[in-house]
Amino acid sequence: MPVMKGLLAPQNTFLDTIATRFDGTHSNFILANAQVAKGFPIVYCSDGFCELAGFARTEVMQKSCSCKFLFGVETNEQLMLQIEKSLEEKVEFKGEIMFYKKNGAPFWCLLDIVPIKNEKGDVVLFLASFKDITDTKVKITSEDKKEDRAKGRSRAGSHFDSARRRSRAVLYHISGHLQRREKNKLKINNNVFVDKPAFPEYKVSDAKKSKFILLHFSTFKAGWDWLILLATFYVAVTVPYNVCFIGNEDLSTTRSTTVSDIAVEILFIIDIILNFRTTYVSKSGQVIFEARSICIHYVTTWFIIDLIAALPFDLLYAFNVTVVSLVHLLKTVRLLRLLRLLQKLDRYSQHSTIVLTLLMSMFALLAHWMACIWYVIGKMEREDNSLLKWEVGWLHELGKRLESPYYGNNTLGGPSIRSAYIAALYFTLSSLTSVGFGNVSANTDAEKIFSICTMLIGALMHALVFGNVTAIIQRMYSRWSLYHTRTKDLKDFIRVHHLPQQLKQRMLEYFQTTWSVNNGIDSNELLKDFPDELRSDITMHLNKEILQLSLFECASRGCLRSLSLHIKTSFCAPGEYLLRQGDALQAIYFVCSGSMEVLKDSMVLAILGKGDLIGANLSIKDQVIKTNADVKALTYCDLQCIILKGLFEVLGLYPEYAHKFVEDIQHDLTYNLREGHESDVISRLSNKSTVPQAEPKGNGSIKKRLPSIVEDEEEEEVEEEETTSLSPIYTRGSSVSHSKKTGSSKSYLGLSLKQLTSGTVPFHSPIRVSSANSPKTKQEADPPNHGTRKEKNLKVQLCSLGTAGTPELSPRIVDGIEDGNSSEETQTFDFGSEQIRPEPRISPSLGESEIGAAFLFIKAEETKQQINKLNSEVTTLTQEVSQLGKDMRSIMQLLENILSPQQPSQFCSLHPTSICPSRESFQTRVSWSAHQPCLHLQANGAHLYHGNVTSDIWSVDPSLVGSNPQRTEAHEQSPVDSELHHSPNLAYSPSHCQVIQEGHLQFLRCISPHSDTTLTPLQSISATLSSSVCSSSETSLHLVLPSRSEEGSITHGPVSSFSLENLPGSWDREGMMSASTEPLENFPVEVVTSTADVKDSKAINV
């Protein structure tokens, strides 16, 4: 016997419970999220609070639970701090405080803040209740003022008045304590004698069923219902039979059925007891487990009928109590139990065989009842004519045919009760199914009238039941047939696809609930044939709740009618997610009943109840709106949703209302689900004024530009050292190089000075740039006068090159190794930093109707994160490569130390004595004191000095060029590139020098010449000298200095050989300094001090 189970999913009824409890006192309360430590935002506010404070619900949502928006000038600051402290410590607070309404009117409020815990004991919500006590406060204040006036009139009684006022204050205080004590006692009593806590927990509450509560859909209850059904049929058969055929004439015959009758009465009494403990399904479809509600429901429905039907009349026969025939008539009240059968008939109608069986049973039962009536009519006719010799009744005819006629004034004899009942049942059945055969016929007027009624009922029953049983089932139970058909299809689908039990339960509950709501009627299918005018009026009536919102007050009736056609009804079960974070929003939802919660990262952002609107602020041009949170049902929720696609169509037809709708929906939404809503606001504020992007420094004369990803508008200038560290090789065009060669030295040095003062120095060698790729070198390359720079979100800028023609790029630059015999002339290219100017980024302002503001902002943030990640990976890789190189050099030095003889460690220290910058002459002079013999390099020459070394240098900080070996502080400055100007052989020949500091130690970086027969070209050598560098006391150094002939061809200069036998056995790295010269043709020279400074032994001649 299938039974509608009802809605059994566990629900979170916290909001309903709180609202129900506050209806008895005051319904002014708010709920705040206790898991967000910053501000504790409000997630729900009652209608009473909105009326009390004068704020709309949308204005209160997401504000702080401390109610700072209600504070005013007379609000006690100490109470403010206590409220904040109680929220931080998550403890209860209660006090009287003055608040201010939205219109500025003050009112005294009794504020009570209580923390709400979940099933784990964690505080997840704050419940703040507000009670207006302004009248009480005003009354007390007016009494005090009256006393003050009386005090002013008679000072003699001032002492008495003050004492009285003081005593009244004490009594008031004591009465308050007594009230609190009484409340505490009530709380204690409630906690002791009541199962419910003082405040409900915010959790999904399972149905708490007592073990003495019987489920109405359980197997035992189904079997018991079948037993009661059989007992009901027994009563329907035996009661009319006993009343009509037996009466009180034959008690011995009556006693034979007394046992079964008593058993049936006992069953009915037990059924009454079980009904008081059996669950039932409410009108809303929920299963009721509460014993009190079950008792009330049963008493007000079927209890009276069941009680009368269960009266133990047959116990009177069991105790030999003489009864009159009226008692037998009272037993017919038990036939009211058949009404319970009609109530449950829909449960038995899922199978056609059961329906047919029930119909046949009802037909036979009707024939049985009519047979009893037919016998009573014949009996009464015989008794009324007992004094006459009248023998025309059907009982007389039956007695004659059976040879048992009546005699003794028709009081004795006659057919037996058994024969009479069979004959009566035969007559009624033949009359119901046909017109009869005449062997048992009606002779008297009463019998004929009854026969006529029987024939009419028979014709109706025959036409309804036997004529077309299938049509009867289809007409009467077509809806249920469809229900069971769909249920069977659903179960088959679940069985075929092996769906899990949880998903199966959800599908069945959703189907049953939606069916109970609309009874299987598809409103769209039903209304599609109606004209649009009538269909619009019908849908407006069906959706009148959502159309009565203030959002649609300005809409015309035509607009509302068009909009009502796009409103759908939806249903959500407890625990079901209406929307997931990141889903495309398809509709705007209005909560008709139930409660829901908005979740993000398992935190409650808002609680939605009846009358709340949830969706997103719209724009006419919106295509896709992504949700920023989850929406989950706490209870069974009925929703009405406006499909966005249809909404945009309607707004397109009514443009005069569209703008108003877009503005108003932002204020009417209880919670805005638009993804990036907060970011959209920030981006609009930041894009009101477009900040032009700073022009980063480049490294060459570039006409064309490559497309780029630039930094944000707020980024600062990018230094050239950072730019060049990201590029492996920098070149310059031949035309630009030629113009620089033919220019005057003053203009060239002026340009260089301008670049130095602006913080940029162009590199004249691609190898030097590649050597600065290490993180340490990059850090040291920053000039000290620029200080620290903020971290920037870099974006890759691709610029286009613009030259007179395609430059020849040497493919040998790829690996940095060149054949020593090659003397091929190649072009070099220089990119001037003053030529690079990225186009300023123009960020279009985002208007309020701009649809892509949030999307573009998020895309920009993602791009920044990706570029930052890529930059960090490149930096990490560079550091690893640099560390690997250092490790290799350390291993080489260790091997040399092991293989070479140990020598005492000494060093050649350099001390700067003076520096005299002069921008007019573009030259300064620096003198170095060498306590020990040192090697000094000048253009086209190198000399070994035992005393002072003097060279020309300009625009260089002396602390970056040399250092005292005795100083202990570490220098964190980056590598410094400077121009050395010498003129021993070539006029205005600029040299190139780089001094790199590592703490307070120094090491040199050398660059090999571009083309040479002995030194490896295009190779950067870091000559880091340590102990036992020189393997022998006699070492000769060969330098090959290229020079420029008059014809412009490149030739090799003189080879200078210097003996280093007077040098100490080893040079300490601290005192090592060197300079590499670069003639006008940009061919650097290199200083080599020992074989340990080069990786290729063929590079020098020892």
Swiss-Prot record:
Region cNMP-binding domain, annotated ranges: 551-668
UniProt motif Selectivity filter: location: 434-439
Glycosylation-annotated residues: 320, 409
Start and end residues of each PAC domain: 93-145
Catalytic activity annotation: K(+)(in) = K(+)(out)
Cytoplasmic side: 1-225, 277-298, 349-353, 470-1102
Family of this protein: Belongs to the potassium channel family. H (Eag) (TC 1.A.1.20) subfamily. Kv12.1/KCNH8 sub-subfamily.
Quaternary structure, from the entry: The potassium channel is probably composed of a homo- or heterotetrameric complex of pore-forming alpha subunits that can associate with modulating beta subunits.
Name of the protein in its database record: Voltage-gated delayed rectifier potassium channel KCNH8
Annotated source species: Rattus norvegicus (Rat)
